[in-house]
């Protein structure tokens, strides 16, 4: 099997996205990503709650922007971030390829991806994609969503021309007519849906979305478990606040992503579920169903065992005593 590069760089926004969360100089730094597809991370960054969780330690907090699961996995692979946000299947792909990550926390259950086109293309179903150009970001949930949709229609990646672009660039390519369809990701997908006439989500399947996984480097969990707990505790505070304050959370998403309040509310109030933060049987079952895709599409190394890596990836115990005990969740 030919090995394919499974973590692709973007080179975009990295330098400008590193923001110090607190000002110590003698201690360690914990680097955590934030992402427009992870609203709770935006809440923590806006409120300063992660820095607050480390305020009485000698540990600095640094934020780095992830534009997609592929970039988040790059941070993990290079040891550039101790904590990073990906889709579930992207986390399994990375773990299967030897990236030392564990998922003790699920930051969302979203319907964040669908297949998008414009009415004038004449595309009405997945079968109509045969021979067409489709934008997608390899190694992310929209890419795996596309593969599952093609499989359902009796097609494969070989039957379409996949144009590998980061999510915002895929949106722009569709608007500009450079591709016929796009495996979209919110909030960019919702922006297209609400603010561009003729945009259509022509294929939706919530079950093909693979959750939002918060991945911790194994070394961070082993060597600094108290710091890892502080991160989870901050996430619990942010999750509970976001559930109680959906309009305000959408406002933070709108501000950070530079999109309208209407787009942000579509994403957060209609397509994002924060109710189940612990990995469990549902996540394990979904990854088991999708593991063969990683091998079939050549997205893991020849000696990788995606199905066997699921147990190595998911940790249902680490955060179990934290969830529900994070405090008030408020200001």
PLM region descriptions:
Residues 28-155, 162-164, 180-183, 201:
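Short, glycine-/small- and polar/acidic-enriched structural segments
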Residues 39, 224-301:
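Secondary-structure end/capping motifs
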Residues 54, 80, 85, 95, ...:
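Sec/Tat-exported extracytoplasmic proteins
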Residues 294-331:
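Conserved C-terminal helix/tail region of periplasmic/extracytoplasmic solute-binding proteins
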């Amino acid at each position: 099997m030919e090995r394919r590069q499974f973590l692709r760089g973007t080179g975009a926004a990295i330098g400008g996205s590193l923001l110090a969360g607190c000002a110590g100089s003698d201690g360690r730094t914990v680097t955590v990503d934030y992402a427009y597809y992870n609203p709770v991370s935006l809440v923590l960054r806006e409120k300063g709650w992660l820095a607050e969780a480390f305020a009485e330690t000698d540990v600095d907090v640094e934020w780095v922007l992830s534009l997609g699961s592929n970039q988040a996995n790059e941070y993990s692979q290079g040891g550039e971030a101790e904590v990073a946000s990906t889709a579930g299947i992207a986390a399994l792909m990375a773990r299967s390829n030897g990236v030392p990550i564990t998922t003790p926390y699920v930051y969302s259950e979203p319907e964040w991806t669908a297949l998008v086109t414009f009415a004038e293309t004449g595309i009405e179903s997945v079968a109509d994609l045969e021979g067409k150009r489709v934008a997608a970001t390899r190694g992310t949930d929209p890419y795996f969503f596309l593969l599952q949709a093609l499989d359902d229609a009796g097609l494969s990646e070989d039957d379409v021309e996949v144009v590998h672009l980061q999510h915002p660039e895929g949106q722009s390519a569709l608007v500009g007519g450079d591709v016929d369809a796009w495996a979209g990701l919110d909030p960019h997908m919702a922006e297209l849906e609400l603010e561009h006439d003729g945009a259509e989500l022509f294929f939706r399947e919530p079950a093909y979305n693979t959750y939002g996984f918060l991945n911790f480097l194994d070394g961070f969990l082993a060597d600094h478990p108290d710091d890892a707990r502080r991160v989870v505790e901050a996430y619990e505070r942010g999750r509970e606040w976001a559930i109680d304050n959906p309009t305000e959370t959408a406002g933070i998403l709108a501000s950070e992503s530079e999109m309208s309040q209407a787009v942000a509310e579509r994403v957060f109030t209609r397509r994002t579920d924060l109710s189940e933060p612990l990995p469990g049987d549902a996540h394990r079952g979904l990854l088991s169903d999708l593991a063969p895709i990683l091998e079939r599409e050549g997205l893991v190394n020849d000696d990788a065992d995606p199905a066997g890596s699921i147990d190595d990836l998911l940790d249902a115990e680490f955060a179990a005593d934290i969830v529900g005990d994070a405090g008030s969740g408020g200001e």
